[in-house]
């Protein structure tokens, strides 16, 4: 299965029981910042934005004072799981990032998708990739 298939079929799909509710954008990005696969709507990010995200996984709390930036959009960092999940909020939407052994799984959402639904979609794929040694 290609990485693009993971994005298309496991991130950018209608959320169970909520037809038409899906993430706004999603991607799988290597720890080095290389994009493995992404939705057409995933923002173009800067290397320093990815560096900040990776630093926060290694030093939890790093992004809290400045916020999480991705593609020029600033998200307020909210409670995640230190070293495993970063969550951010911006207005009625937000972002969830799950770290696996080799990659970061990104999900970006807007209403009517809820933070919990985004977390479920992103973390389920991230946990699967971890189980596969990825």
From Swiss-Prot:
Its main location: cytoplasm. Phosphorylated by MAP kinases. GO terms for cellular component: cell cortex; cytoskeleton. One of its GO terms (molecular function) is actin monomer binding. It comes from the Eukaryota. The keyword Phosphoprotein applies. Keywords: Actin-binding, Allergen, Cytoplasm, Cytoskeleton, Phosphoprotein. InterPro entries: PFN, PFN_euk, PFN_sf, Profilin_CS. It is found in: Cytoplasm, Cytoskeleton. The modification Phosphothreonine is found at residue 114. Binds to actin and affects the structure of the cytoskeleton. At high concentrations, profilin prevents the polymerization of actin, whereas it enhances it at low concentrations. Occurs in many kinds of cells as a complex with monomeric actin in a 1:1 ratio. The variability of the residues taking part of IgE-binding epitopes might be responsible of the difference in cross-reactivity among olive pollen cultivars, and between distantly related pollen species, leading to a variable range of allergy reactions among atopic patients. This is Profilin-4.
């Amino acid at each position: 299965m290609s990485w693009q298939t993971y994005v298309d079929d496991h991130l950018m799909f209608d959320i169970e029981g909520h037809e038409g509710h899906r993430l706004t954008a999603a991607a799988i990005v290597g720890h080095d910042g290389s994009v493995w696969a992404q939705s057409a709507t995933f923002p173009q990010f800067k290397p320093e934005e990815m560096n900040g995200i990776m630093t926060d996984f290694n030093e939890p709390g790093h992004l809290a004072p400045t916020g999480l930036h991705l593609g020029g959009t600033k998200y307020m960092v909210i409670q995640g799981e230190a070293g495993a999940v970063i969550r951010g909020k911006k207005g009625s939407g937000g972002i969830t990032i799950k770290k696996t052994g080799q990659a970061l799984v990104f999900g970006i959402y807007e209403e009517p998708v809820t933070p919990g639904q985004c977390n479920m979609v992103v973390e389920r794929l991230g946990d699967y990739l971890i189980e596969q040694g990825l």
